[in-house]
Amino acid sequence: MKLSKKLFDEIIYTVKISPYESGGFVGGVTDTVTNVVYDSKNSYFASYIPDNDLLNDSIRTWAKNSIEFLGMFHTHYPNCASMSLGDEKFISELMKNICDENDILYFPIVIARKEISVYAAKLINSKCEIKKDELILLG
């Protein structure tokens, strides 16, 4: 996944003032994030639950400007860079419900409000495969 240094810094700054397990949505073109929407409605101690209305509104608004929905991000506590079983289950269900075969969505995890670890999910033969992805900072 590609992300400008400016957006990287914006995400890190914004989540510093948000509770852990908060998140948002990323949009852009192919594998390059150009837009971020922060979701502050549903933050809980141990999990991030996206605001479906905000997500759907974001997707509709982006579509009018040829911006694709690329995925969701959320924050984790320090020393927790990997996906939880809950994360994997949520992503698998999401992929099966909204994606076509071979679609890829990205699920960045912001760790300790200072770094970003990216995972890519792909639907192959109706099964969701989640793999660590490289974060490429642009500019």
Each language-model region and where it sits:
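Conserved beta-strand-loop surface patch within small alpha/beta domains used
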Residues: 1-69, 78-139
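Histidine-centered divalent metal-coordination motifs
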Residues: 74-76
